[in-house]
Amino acid sequence: MTSSADSGRDAAWLDDFLALTLAGDAPPAEAGECAARAVRWRWLGDGLLRLEPADAAQRMQSVLVSAGVHGDETAPIELLSTLVRDIARGALPLRCRLLVALGNPGAMRAGERYLDDDLNRLFGGRHAQLAASREAPRAAQLEAAAALFFSTAGRARGARWHIDMHTAIRASVFEQFALLPHTGEPPTRTMFEWLGEAQIAAVLLHTTKGSTFSHFTAQACGALACTLELGKVMPFGANDLSRFAPADAAVRRLVSGRRDAPRGALPRAFTVVDQITKQSDALELFVANDVPNFTPFARGTLLARDGDYRYAVRHEQERIVFPNPSVKPGLRAGLLVIETTRDTHAALA
């Protein structure tokens, strides 16, 4: 039988989950207890960790929190590692089943966004089309881990959550914003209120099925899922984590079951109306490198040219999000959105 002291030694690595992952190491044991035996943990593989209260109830929420799907987006990775540490020490009570995922450990170790292909474009089975990519098996592993985790979760609304944390390549008119996957159903008031609590200023609403991690968990696992963009890409150790305090606090309240947060204003809503798709390496994107996400453009403005392809603004005003001419041909080089705050808030389910 494992003694309390042995269990504590086996769980010491939980003080720095990030360091263990960056080193490519495995913990001394695959399962154990922490937080004075109040929490059970199980290491599920590189960058994957499940934590559950020792007295877990059948109707308890199941929450997946992920970061590092892009390996150079370091601030959310550091926040997630600190979350694990505080749960393991007993400083943060755990009142849910929690799956922690550091998405792309190989890219994290290399200090790169990805090794071969953007991992956040490979979910929903798309990884099968790129079998030679080093990201493909990781996408399949993350899908399997999420599906297994949620397979035993409750089915009531709000019983399943997925928060996928990122940072953006460029600045934004709204420094911290969220993206909600398209499910065919109106977005929920529960999610919008949680995002308001996290002081997220804007929400981008997808209108077609995507291949991101949060799209997969929403579609295949029935989770309330969102992608959070929490600032700009910085190297490990160079982040001012205080800038992310409201979002971090909202995640902590979610996993600890607290309901004492002051209600924030609902975020503004923006709906995708089109995208710029890179046809070839001849793409010209008429958006400067320092133009922030959500910058507005007036009707008629030419934003992109690629051979015979043109994209000009069709609505009175469209805002561009994630402009990136460096993506591979066939991929999205920018999203165009319009504000739909009033209608979106009125339709919240």
Curated annotation (Swiss-Prot):
Gene Ontology molecular functions: hydrolase activity, acting on ester bonds; succinylglutamate desuccinylase activity; zinc ion binding
Record EC number: 3.5.1.96
Cofactor note: Binds 1 zinc ion per subunit.
Cysteine disulfide partners in this protein: none
Keyword annotations of the record: Arginine metabolism, Hydrolase, Metal-binding, Zinc
Short name of any one Pfam family annotated for the protein: AstE_AspA_cat
Biological process, per Gene Ontology: arginine catabolic process to glutamate; arginine catabolic process to succinate
Summary of the function given for this chain in its UniProt record: Transforms N(2)-succinylglutamate into succinate and glutamate.
NCBIfam families: arg_catab_astE (TIGR03242), PRK05324.1 (NF003706)
Family: Belongs to the AspA/AstE family. Succinylglutamate desuccinylase subfamily.
Stated name of the protein: Succinylglutamate desuccinylase
Organism (species): Burkholderia pseudomallei (strain K96243)
The gene coding this protein: astE
